[in-house]
Amino acid sequence: SDVYKRQPYGRIMSYVYREEEKTMLSAEEQLHTIASGAAQIVPESALLEKLKRGTPLNIKLGVDPTAPDIHLGHAVPLRKLRQFQDLGHGVTLIIGDGTALIGDPSGRNTTRPQLTSEQIKANAQTYVDQAFKILDPEKTALRYNSEWLLSLNMEDLLKLASNFTVARILERDDFHKRYTNSQPISLHEFLYPLMQAYDSVVIKADVELGGTDQLFNLLAGRELMEKMGMEPQVCLTLPLLEGTDGVQKMSKSYGNYIGLTDEPADMFGKVMSIPDELMVKYYRLASALPVDQIDEIERGLAADELHPNKVKRALAKNIVAAYYDEAAAQAAEEQFDLVFKQHAVPDDIPEFAADLTPNDDGTVYLAKLLADASLAASAGEARRLIDGGGVKVNGEALPAKSYNVDPALLAGATLQVGKRKFVKLV
């Protein structure tokens, strides 16, 4: 820990995934790395036995391209896949273009709207492009489950369905709640865990990853493999990652997300805004740092040997460097210091051609303008930001309820939302 005191920007800040010679770790050492950040491994003893064989395992992650953009919360299982790749194992990333026609009901109290094939295809391509910012494409088998799911005939489907009972499916927490509350459950939703389980059979998965809300589906895969005379997969679940507010899970709808396509300065600033108590969790779930170094950081923080601000800067630089490069991470830190320490307006703020035509009452609806300028996700979020004092015009915070303003105030103005977002109106 003395090294970190003397060189806080040493290896904890500059580490980026790189190809290097690695000695083969023992099964126990691999398990320690794999278990870092995991919520559950079911059963852990079976995973250890698989690792002891010394042959590469087939690690499965299935994703439904129901939304195109990925944030750090979505990337948690991708990071774990990358960990497996670095340990020498094989990865199969399944794009659920077949299951996306249903939509995963996990954690929902209503039926998901079904997407068209065109929407799914477009979302899938965007997802894959972002996923390969994390995964090594050369070590990833990319499969689309429409390959096998859409070729199932009625006989195949009936045989598959015969392996599960309605009572078993209703054990799922979300289905159970909807059933007891007399909320509708569409019959096609019952098929989702069966189809996800069948994916594991087709690719012969050794381990399947998923969120904690996916455990039922993962166990269904294990159960189906056993019934078909195969060695069952191990189920590894990962916790939900809290967003920048430190309370709600990371989500665009909560406005607390850090997107993989965010600009480096935005990404850096958002990471710096997370509560200190979430730093180690972000290191384990969202960073590219090796587990032994994260263990050392956790010990240093607990012993009060490391300054939280330096550790958080290391985290922010590590995350930015993982998605861009070290130069971008360094520039993002300098931009952060300029804006936060000197309260300056950045030199390179984007411009936005605003329509300042007044409404009938002679004002401009600022909430919509903020959304149009990508300073807020929606007019509703913009109103909440205004009410919270988070919107400034030419450096002056607007009072609450200032949704409609004089267009003269906005002509050529610099709009600021929070501490990181700026736009020059032209």
Describe every region a protein language model picked out.
Residues 9-17:
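Short, positively charged and aromatic/hydrophobic N-terminal segments
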Residues 103-107, 152-158, 246-250:
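Short acidic, glycine/serine/threonine-rich loops at helix termini
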Residues 1-4:
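Short, small-residue-biased leader/transition segments that mark boundaries at the very start
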Residues 225-426:
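Conserved nucleotide- and phosphate/pyrophosphate-binding catalytic cores
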Residues 41-105, 207-215, 221:
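N-terminal catalytic cores of NTP/NDP-binding nucleotidyl/phosphoryl-transfer enzymes
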